[in-house]
């Protein structure tokens, strides 16, 4: 089965939101959106962030308790000598767990390399479709065209206020406002464990240089993430396995993504 893909065109904007030129996009932005593959790969990659946990094999067993035996008119649970206090058994205070978690459990789910690359291509394609971006809940001006491609000089932005001003000029700052308004206190014990607030997902900026000033400038803006094109994955493009994240690309990052992923469309 062969797919006939048609290349899309995109407008390139400068820091002030003005149209600079129009370019032809690579085929990776024309691929059909496969939600099933995106979800499968997202869940597999998410397992890499899980921390193995287990219990001390001797937990609850550090006692000399033994059962007193039968025909005494009492339960046959192990009991501490000279006190008769039940111990060791799973149904006793301070006893062992019945089936404790084991560090040997395999937490990381593996996925085929081809499938992983296909998921990234599919997620990239969703970011180029206004319908998918809108359906995900992002807010932006009607004049915004997708995908959003900007000139490389935006990576030189040094302060958060400059980045916010840039987002306002290209018409996506309303999405940052949406995230700020929806920051809320988490339910449950996570509040005690350094996760007091829950924050929604906002715009993603894909750059070509991890050491550029914009990486630090944007990290304190609510919901905004900055990622190198070499490292971008389904985790960034489709958080929660929901495709269509509002994404901003630099001109060079498009070329890096094309070099990295176009071979998969040919093979």
Curated annotation (Swiss-Prot):
Q: Which GO terms describe its cellular component?
A: ribonucleoprotein complex; ribosome
Question: InterPro entries of this UniProt entry?
Answer: Ribosomal_uL4 (IPR002136), Ribosomal_uL4_dom_sf (IPR023574), Ribosomal_uL4_euk/arc_CS (IPR013000), Ribosomal_uL4_euk/arch (IPR045240), Ribosomall_uL4-arc (IPR019970)
Quote the Pfam families the UniProt record gives: Ribosomal_L4
Q: Which NCBIfam families match?
A: rpl4p_arch
Family label:
Belongs to the universal ribosomal protein uL4 family.
Biological role stated in the UniProt entry: One of the primary rRNA binding proteins, this protein initially binds near the 5'-end of the 23S rRNA. It is important during the early stages of 50S assembly. It makes multiple contacts with different domains of the 23S rRNA in the assembled 50S subunit and ribosome.
Protein's UniProt name: Large ribosomal subunit protein uL4
Name its species.
Saccharolobus islandicus (strain Y.G.57.14 / Yellowstone #1) (Sulfolobus islandicus)
Q: Which gene encodes it?
A: rpl4
């Amino acid at each position: 089965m062969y797919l006939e893909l048609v290349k899309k065109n995109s407008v390139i904007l400068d820091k002030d939101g003005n149209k600079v030129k129009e370019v032809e996009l690579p085929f990776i932005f024309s691929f059909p959106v496969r939600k099933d593959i995106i979800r499968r790969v997202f869940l597999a990659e998410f397992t890499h962030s899980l921390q193995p946990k287990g219990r001390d094999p001797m937990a609850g067993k550090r006692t000399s308790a033994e059962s007193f035996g039968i025909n005494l008119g009492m339960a046959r649970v192990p009991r501490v000598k000279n006190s008769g206090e039940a111990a060791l058994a799973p149904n006793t205070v301070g006893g062992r767990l019945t089936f404790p978690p084991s560090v040997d459990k395999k937490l990381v789910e593996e996925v085929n390399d081809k499938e992983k690359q296909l998921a990234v291509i599919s997620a990239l394609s969703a970011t180029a479709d206004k319908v998918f971006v809108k359906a995900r809940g992002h807010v932006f001006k009607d004049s915004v065209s997708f995908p959003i491609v900007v000139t490389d000089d935006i990576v030189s932005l040094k302060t958060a206020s400059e980045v916010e001003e840039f987002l306002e000029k290209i018409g996506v700052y309303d999405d940052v406002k949406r995230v700020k308004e929806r920051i809320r206190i988490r339910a449950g014990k996570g509040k005690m464990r350094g996760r007091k607030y829950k924050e929604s997902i906002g715009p993603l900026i894909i750059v070509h240089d991890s050491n550029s000033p914009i990486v630090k400038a944007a990290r304190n803006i609510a919901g905004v993430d900055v990622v190198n094109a070499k490292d971008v994955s389904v985790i960034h493009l489709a958080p929660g396995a929901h495709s269509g994240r509002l994404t901003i690309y630099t001109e060079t990052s498009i070329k890096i993504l094309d070099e990295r992923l176009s071979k998969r469309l040919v093979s």
